[in-house]
Structures are given as structure tokens and as C-alpha cells.
A protein has these predicted regions:
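Extracytosolic ligand-binding ectodomains
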Residues: 1-130
């Protein structure tokens, strides 16, 4: 709805469709094939969440809550975000990218122009009682 006024606007996020990771490239291609459009940030988070759960279910019995929690904490899956881990309070540790709105053919999308924060965890993790 914003149209051309959005071009050049910069924003930050932990994901972008142009991240050069095998899992992300495959995810974006499959999503475009299935839905005819570029996936959103929220779609990538949902995909990562499903793969996190599947990775934990592959190594731990879901009825054993402690074992399953440990398997989730290991986060042993190929994320669309690249390297992925959880901090001590279960927030992700991840890069935060600077993106810019551009035209790609006839669609508006974001492209990475830099990294704002590397391996960033929750700023308040030290205050968490977990």
C-alpha cells in the first residue's frame, strides 16, 4: 500500500530472503513454488520452529519432558537464519541484519545491506532467573 515511498527504507530483522544459507535458499525457493510469493519473516520463523520441534522429536521422547527440553535447547537443525542457538533464558542468539526495501522485478522486498549485531542474545538475559 505504501508503494514507491517504501523504496530505500532501512529496517532490521534476524532474517531476510537473500540470506546465503542452504536451508534458507531451499526454504525460499520451495515457498515461492508453493505460494507464488516471497516468504515473510514470520513464515521463516514458523519454518524454523517446525524444524526445531522435529529435530528434538528425532532424539527425545516427547513424554520425557526433561529429555525433550534438552533436545530443544540443543537446537540441532539447519535454520533459515544460519547459525542458531538459544541463550540461557531460551531467547535465540542470532545475527540482526540491516535490510533495505528494493524492487526485485515487480515486487518490493528487503535486501541485506549490513549486519547490525552479531550473535546477539537477549539484552536482559542476565536478569532472568532461569
Amino acid at each position: 500500500a505504501v508503494g514507491d515511498a517504501a523504496l530505500g527504507v532501512r529496517n532490521t530483522a534476524q532474517w531476510s530472503p537473500d540470506l546465503d544459507y542452504a536451508a534458507n535458499t531451499a526454504f525460499v525457493a520451495a515457498y515461492i513454488e508453493a505460494y507464488g510469493r516471497v516468504p515473510s519473516l514470520y513464515s521463516s520463523q514458523g519454518f524454523d520452529t517446525a524444524n526445531l520441534l522435529l529435530s528434538a522429536m528425532a532424539v527425545a521422547d516427547i513424554s520425557d519432558m526433561d529429555a525433550f527440553r534438552t533436545a530443544l535447547e540443543a537446537a540441532d537443525f539447519a535454520s533459515t537464519r544460519g547459525d542458531f542457538a538459544f541463550g540461557p533464558n531460551h531467547h535465540p542468539i542470532q545475527d540482526i541484519y540491516v535490510r533495505e526495501v528494493v524492487m526485485d522485478g515487480d515486487i518490493f522486498t528487503n535486501r541485506i545491506v549490513g549486519v547490525a549485531l552479531e550473535d546477539r542474545g537477549d539484552a536482559y538475559a542476565a536478569e532472568c532467573s532461569m
